[in-house]
Regions:
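Active-site-proximal beta-strand elements of phosphoester/diester hydrolases
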Residues: 4, 140-145, 181-185
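Structural motif
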Residues: 52-56, 88, 182-184
Length: 237
């Protein structure tokens, strides 16, 4: 399994290396060979050769650098998405892919992969989050964002139990299109939500008949504990 960690040195704001470490460990438990290529500005990306492409959160300055460099891969990125390659984008990296993005306070053209535009919030939002996907699977994480997206036609999450919705409608968050998964959720996404990591592993391996379900007991207990604590804190508020 070949994984591309895009802009690994610029987009590792919230422990994104940890996300790929967890994913790699889960794959190895299934006796898969895993190769992670760490790519950044100056490297020549050949996105089609990868089974999964990952991009994490960026500081404002690093966002500007990546926004400029990533433009040349827009067509290739669109092709790999349509080819049903797996992609996971977390934090503000999802802002790169719309029609408009905000770079250092200015609205500029995005990569145009999706139709949404980025809108600034009145003030930065920070807080824990509990989101439900279309199958009512509950995801937990943290949000630290200065913007939202104006419209999402194919949301990943359709119920916001706790946290900030990703659109002005206040009902949806994230993007799920084919095998593209994008969300503002961080902290880190795959480490906190073990079941999603298991899902990715199954899909990357082609849902093999010999897939053996690992208990992931510690990860499951940590998830349950986090969720219980988040809900408890929500009631206290």
């Amino acid at each position: 399994i070949k994984i591309a960690h895009l802009y690994y040195d610029l987009a590792n704001l919230y422990g994104d290396n940890g996300n790929l470490k967890v994913l790699s460990d889960y794959l190895i438990q299934q006796h898969a060979e895993v190769k992670i290529d760490k790519l950044t500005v100056g490297d020549n990306f050949n996105l089609d050769q990868y089974d999964l492409i990952y991009l994490g959160s960026l500081t404002e300055n690093n966002f500007a650098i990546v926004a400029e460099d990533f433009k040349k891969y827009a067509k290739e990125l669109s092709k790999v998405i349509e080819a049903r390659k797996h992609l996971v984008f977390t934090g503000n990296s999802i802002e790169l892919l719309g029609k408009k993005m905000i770079v250092k306070g200015n609205s500029v053209a995005g990569l145009g992969i999706f139709d949404y535009e980025v809108l600034p919030l009145d003030k930065r939002y920070m807080g824990e989050a509990i989101f439900h996907d279309v199958n009512d699977q509950i995801f937990i994480g943290f949000q630290n964002q200065a913007n939202i997206l104006n419209e999402i036609t194919q949301p990943w999450f359709t119920k916001i139990e706790k946290g900030l919705a990703g659109t002005p409608s206040h009902t949806t968050e994230g993007i799920h299109y084919l095998n593209f998964y994008g969300t503002y959720l961080i902290a880190p996404l795959l480490a906190r939500n073990y079941f999603f990591t298991e899902q990715l592993v199954k899909e990357l391996l082609g849902n093999p008949a010999d897939y053996h379900q690992e208990p992931h007991t510690i990860d499951a207990l940590a998830y349950a504990s986090f969720l219980q604590e988040l809900r408890k804190n929500g009631k206290e508020e």
